[in-house]
Amino acid sequence: MKFLVILTLCIAGAIAHCDKAPFIKASWNQVKHNEVDILYTVFKAYPEIQDRFPQFAGKDLEAIKETAEFAVHSTRIVSFMSEIVSLVGNPAVQSSIDLLLVKMANDHKARGVTKELFEKFNIAFMGYLKSHTTWDEKTENAWKVVGDEHHAIVYSILE
């Protein structure tokens, strides 16, 4: 029931936040091809996240950063984010965003990923965005408002 309430609020919020999409898309377009750097930043900030990936657990981050396996996995993660960003701001496809987030959250929950790990991922990711894009108050607000809605869906499943 909690999930359905959150989902309803997020759908309603999507209509109210169409004005946020240009800021999210503009900043994302500046970093969406930095897949390896984004995942490297997350792993560097939170090694416990790296340890959740069996193919990278216990390995030297500097060494794996240059591997094809790291590049492929980084691209998977960033491509998912790109898909979400491409849909943001269009109320007609809000249910698609919600379904993608639900599937991702369920997949990660099945692997034992916690809300706390997602929060840490987000902290590192947002830090990367802020330091690698043209960042201002409107951009920060857009990411916060839309991000909070998306995180509510994910966290309702991970809790």
UniProtKB/Swiss-Prot annotation:
Molecular function per GO: heme binding; metal ion binding; oxygen binding; oxygen carrier activity
Domain of life: Eukaryota
Record domain Globin: where: 17-159
SUPFAM superfamilies: Globin-like
Annotated GO CC locations: extracellular region; hemoglobin complex
Secretion signal span: 1-16
Keywords: Heme, Iron, Metal-binding, Oxygen transport, Signal, Transport
Keyword Iron found: yes
Keyword Heme recorded: yes
Binding site for heme b: 73, 108
Family assignment from sequence similarity: Belongs to the globin family.
Note: There are at least 12 different components in Midge globin.
PANTHER family associated with the record: GLOBIN-LIKE PROTEIN
Protein's UniProt name: Globin CTT-W
Gene: CTT-W
